[in-house]
Swiss-Prot record:
Protein name: 4-hydroxy-tetrahydrodipicolinate reductase
Location of this chain's protein in the cell: Cytoplasm
GO cellular component: cytosol
UniProt-listed SUPFAM superfamilies: Glyceraldehyde-3-phosphate dehydrogenase-like, C-terminal domain (SSF55347), NAD(P)-binding Rossmann-fold domains (SSF51735)
GO molecular function, one term: 4-hydroxy-tetrahydrodipicolinate reductase
Broad class of where this protein is predominantly found: cytoplasm
Organismal lineage: Bacteria, Pseudomonadati, Pseudomonadota, Gammaproteobacteria, Lysobacterales
HAMAP family in the cross-refs: DapB (MF_00102)
Pfam families the UniProt entry points to: DapB_C, DapB_N
Transmembrane region(s): none
Designated gene of the protein: dapB
Chain residues that bind (S)-2,3,4,5-tetrahydrodipicolinate: H150, G159, T160
Biological-process GO terms, alphabetical: diaminopimelate biosynthetic process; lysine biosynthetic process via diaminopimelate
Family: Belongs to the DapB family.
Binding site for NAD(+): G12, A13, S14, G15, R16, M17, G93, T94, T95, A117, S118, N119, F120
């Protein structure tokens, strides 16, 4: 018995992550991209067999099983609303969301399964757990989170740095942040715990953006069939 491919809608398809998602999804027989949503009216309506839609045409997107969103904060509310309206899961890696948008996520989680994360790599999922353990085991130590990304990344600190900070804070640390924007750095995060005469440093370096796209695609598959709720990446990939 063959299983039909999962129908995926990619929102934010013109960005770095969107392009990686399209390329990797095309290599996966278990996935079928039914639509790609971009900010402005596309110059081509169909590219490599994938229909393209402008953001203001989102309501006319074809039927899908799960949506994956890597866009900008101003484009987040419409894709969240569409998933709620159609009762479909959402995987989102859009960073820079404000408090109202985060509240909207929590409200939507009562109706659909969703996962929002600043980083979908397996390594960062493990790093987050290690930060929690280190912060709880090293009370009173200084905690510093240093992140570095390419010059075009707008938000700082990065969403991943903030997520790591939340993990540290939840275990009693008081993290400080520093950001670097330089060249074409894909993503580097260092969490340092410094005490008297010693320092613990936890580091994750991404050398290829594909790790994030693969993680998001894997999370999308795992989210199918889940009851409504807000899931963590580690719940789906570890």
């Amino acid at each position: 018995m063959t299983t039909s491919p999962v129908k995926v809608l990619i929102h934010g398809a013109s960005g770095r992550m969107g392009k990686a998602l399209l390329r990797l999804a095309a290599e996966d027989d278990a996935l079928h991209v039914v639509g790609a949503v971009v900010g402005r009216s596309p110059s081509q309506r169909v590219v490599d067999g994938v229909p393209y839609f402008a953001a203001n045409e989102l309501g006319g997107a074809p039927a899908f099983d799960v949506a994956i969103d890597f866009s900008l904060p101003q484009g987040f509310a419409p894709i969240l609303a569409l998933c709620v309206q159609r009762g479909k899961p959402l995987v989102s890696g859009t960073t820079g969301l404000d408090e109202a948008q985060r509240a909207g996520l929590l409200q939507a989680a009562g109706q659909i399964p969703l996962v929002w994360a600043s980083n979908f790599s397996l390594g960062v999922a493990v790093l987050t757990e290690l930060v929690e353990r280190a912060a709880g085991s090293l009370p009173g130590w200084d905690c510093d989170i240093i992140e570095a990304h390419h010059v075009h990344k707008q938000d700082a600190p990065s969403g991943t740095a903030l997520t790591l900070g939340e993990a540290a804070t939840g275990s009693g640390a008081q993290p400080r942040f520093a950001s670097v924007r330089a060249g074409d750095i894909v993503g580097e995060h260092s969490v340092q715990f410094t005490g008297l005469g010693e320092r613990v440093e936890l580091i994750h370096r991404a050398t290829n953006r594909d790790i994030f796209a693969r993680g998001a695609l894997h999370a999308a598959k795992r989210l199918l069939g889940k009851p409504p709720g807000s899931y963590r990446v580690r719940d789906l990939v570890l």
